Amino acid sequence: MNSIETHDPTVSYFAEKLRTKIYSLEYSLSPEHKFPFALEEAMTALDWLIGKGVAIENISLCGDSAGAHLAASVTHHLADNQRPNVHSQFLIYPMCDPKCNSQSIELFQSGYLLTKEAMIWFWEKFRKTSQDDTNKTFNLMLYTDDMELPKTIIVTAGFDPLSDEAEEYAFKLHENDNYVKQLHYPSLFHGFASMTRLKAAKKAVDDFLTEYKQIL
């Protein structure tokens, strides 16, 4: 639904606050390009950066919603294939679980911008076959303790249907001794990072960027 153009103001603000270079990936969207097409594009982009002399340990991946899922898919893919992983991942209200049956997705299934019906539709259009649900790079909840993941910060919002699955993903990482930190903003909602004209949203974005900068 979004693109480099829609996210350019947000990414530019992040780069200014973090004082770092950010490379945006214009990845192909479903339903025209189903899983794992975007993951393959992301891996190509990562390998291109490495080929240009950027050390993988100096790379951090960041995304919001579906973009956060893609960032985590890359780190899962690297870990599952015993490749060196990136320095860190910063996941802003990530979509993690194709089952769409958490308590928060039921509680906030409508009336909060993102709906349960929309999420079911997104996953249906994203998956190529039902077997994708058993793939650890598609279904993030299938993370296993033999996967060594990078430092992780996960941003959640109180009125987001995806908040519980993101929190459960954070808990799984914590249980297996991965560095993970959850930043929860109880009064906010899915998509707030792109709505910084709202005072509460801007305050939250500035707060989580301060946290992000500390691990870079």
Would you name each region that the model predicts?
Residues 1-216:
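Alpha/beta-hydrolase superfamily serine-hydrolase fold, recognizing
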